[in-house]
Regions:
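Active-site-adjacent beta-strand/loop module that shapes the phosphate/pyrophosphate-binding cleft
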Residues: 87-109
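N-terminal strand-loop-strand
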Residues: 12-51, 55-56, 77-78, 101-103
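Nudix hydrolase/Nudix homology domain
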Residues: 45-49, 91, 111-149
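Disulfide-bonded cysteines in secreted/extracellular proteins and peptides
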Residues: 8-14, 65
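The catalytic Nudix box helix
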Residues: 51-85, 99, 107
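Short, small-residue-biased leader/transition segments that mark boundaries at the very start
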Residues: 1-9
């Protein structure tokens, strides 16, 4: 049998300990003048729009992951990538790490397998947003607060 704890699962017979792997994902709020980039992923359950997100690959830094995911999913380049915060993410046992980045160039060309829509929005024409408790919504609310000043 297995005995569980918060950190690991231990096999009672052989004593082997198994630590769950953690999947790290990034979330990035891309700013362009007085607008922010919002996308709708095909796997979203609902009609809301959110921020570009993706999983960290072995051997890359979090900042490299941010730049790669934005480029892959939208065709855009970003700069001034800065840490915002993080949130435990229950599925698939992960950690979501949020970043803010500035638009650096390119035209939006969506990765159609992943995204059904994406565009820059000003505070006056925002589409439906993610739920309040999500890291994405906290980041968007922060941007709304900052862009108002």
């Amino acid at each position: 049998g297995l005995v569980g704890s918060e950190m690991c699962i231990r096999d009672r017979k052989c004593g082997r300990e198994v630590y769950p792997s953690i999947s790290t994902a990034i979330l990035v709020l891309v700013r362009k003048e007085d607008s922010l980039l919002l996308v709708h992923a095909r796997n979203f359950k609902g009609t809301f729009n959110s921020l570009v997100a993706g999983f960290l690959e072995t051997g890359e830094t979090l900042e490299e992951c941010v730049a790669r995911e934005v480029k892959e999913e939208t065709g855009l380049d970003v700069t001034n990538i800065t840490y915002f915060g993080n949130q435990a993410w229950p599925y698939p046992s992960g950690l979501m790490v949020g970043f803010i980045a500035d638009y650096a160039g390119g035209e939006i060309k969506l990765q159609e397998e992943e995204l059904s829509s994406g565009d820059f929005y000003t505070r006056d024409n925002l589409p439906e947003l993610p739920r309040k408790l999500s890291l994405a919504r906290k980041m968007i609310d922060w941007w709304l607060e900052c862009s108002h000043k």
